[in-house]
């Protein structure tokens, strides 16, 4: 039942962001499902252009969420009594982050409606960024990277998305000091 509520809220929030012309995309575990891979999740993760942060916050608070943490880089929301689940919002304040939003694929899913989904290459780059910014995230995010590549090699990725861009991933991995980490999983993608 919790997953159904999250899916419903994803649909509602995505519609409202699109209606207000807020540049955003879905990131995190929900994105994996659109690639044809899956992982259980208890929250919805968005990346939003930082220039549209205030209108995005208004949409969330107007949709029954309370912001319990906000910085220049992200905001976290919870719904009263956890009825709608949690939402994490990353603010894209760099050209690279905004480019990820522009590169996202607008999908029209039967149960969810329209939602822009981050490219798989950018999903990996965001995981590397998370590790670079917070070493305590290493076990969880490295596991996610490992599982992504296992699924990618076994099942492939929906053809709606671009193929993995190894050069792009390595460029960001080097920038984030994560080349050694990503080499473990991308040896065959180089």
Model feature map: region roles:
Residues 1-190:
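Compositionally biased terminal segments of proteins
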């Amino acid at each position: 039942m919790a997953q159904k509520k999250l899916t419903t809220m994803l649909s509602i929030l995505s519609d409202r962001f699109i209606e207000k012309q807020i540049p955003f995309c879905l990131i995190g575990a929900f994105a994996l499902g659109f690639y044809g891979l899956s992982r259980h999740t208890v929250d919805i993760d968005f990346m939003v252009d930082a220039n549209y942060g205030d209108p995005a916050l208004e949409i969330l608070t107007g949709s029954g969420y309370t912001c319990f943490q906000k910085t220049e880089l992200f905001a976290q929301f919870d719904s009263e009594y956890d009825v709608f689940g949690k939402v994490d919002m990353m603010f894209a304040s760099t050209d690279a982050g905004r480019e990820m939003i522009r590169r996202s694929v607008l999908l029209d899913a039967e149960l969810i409606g329209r939602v822009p989904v981050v490219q798989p290459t950018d999903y990996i780059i965001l995981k590397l960024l998370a590790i670079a910014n917070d070493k305590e995230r290493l076990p969880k995010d490295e596991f996610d990277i490992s599982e992504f590549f296992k699924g990618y090699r076994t099942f492939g990725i929906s053809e709606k998305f671009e193929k993995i861009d190894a050069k792009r991933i390595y460029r960001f991995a080097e920038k984030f000091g994560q080349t050694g980490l990503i080499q473990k999983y991308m040896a065959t993608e180089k």
